[in-house]
Swiss-Prot record:
Disulphide linkage map: none
Organism in which the protein naturally occurs: Arabidopsis thaliana
Domain of life the protein comes from: Eukaryota
Pfam families: Beta-prop_KIB1-4, F-box
Xref: InterPro entries: F-box-like_dom_sf (IPR036047), F-box_dom (IPR001810), KIB1-4_b-propeller (IPR005174)
PANTHER family the UniProt entry points to: OS09G0392200 PROTEIN, REGULATION PROTEIN, PUTATIVE-RELATED
The name this protein goes by in its record: F-box protein At4g12382
Domain named F-box: residues: 7-53
């Protein structure tokens, strides 16, 4: 006799099945599906294929809604990023933004797709421009 499962949840699906599904999703849909639950987020990030061509980021004059434009397909995506409030982009490479807070001059790395933040130690030197080097690891 079959055992009836009460209140099944999408979070209970095997991660191998979620991996197959998410590996076929466009980046935008992968990000959306990754928001469902922690297990889906982990699988989504592991199979996420970031586009090989650069995207354009338009910074708002006010507020936290940033526009990302895929120049190859000319598609526009809007993303709320309160983490970047009052920040300036100093440099970008391989999906990472090197940011500086206007008010405190704190410097940090930010990945707009994963929303990972890496805070850097305070720098006592006065500087006008900064950059970073990162070899591309495959």
């Amino acid at each position: 006799m079959c055992k009836k499962i009460m209140n099944p949840s999408f979070a209970d699906l095997p991660s191998s099945l979620i991996e197959v599904i998410m590996s076929h999703l466009a980046l935008k849909n992968n990000i959306r599906a990754s928001a469902a639950c922690k297990s889906w987020y982990e699988v989504g990030v592991s199979v996420r294929v970031v586009e090989k061509h650069p995207w354009l980021i338009c910074f708002p004059k006010r507020g936290n809604l940033f526009e990302f434009r895929d120049p190859l397909h000319w598609k526009l995506y809007t993303l709320g990023l309160p983490e970047l409030a009052e920040s300036t982009v100093c440099y970008s490479r391989f999906g990472w933004l090197l940011m500086r807070k206007a008010t405190s001059k704190d410097v940090f790395f930010f990945n707009p797709f994963s929303r990972d933040i890496i805070s850097l130690p305070k720098c006592e030197l006065a500087f006008e421009h900064i950059t970073f080097y990162c070899p591309h690891i495959r």
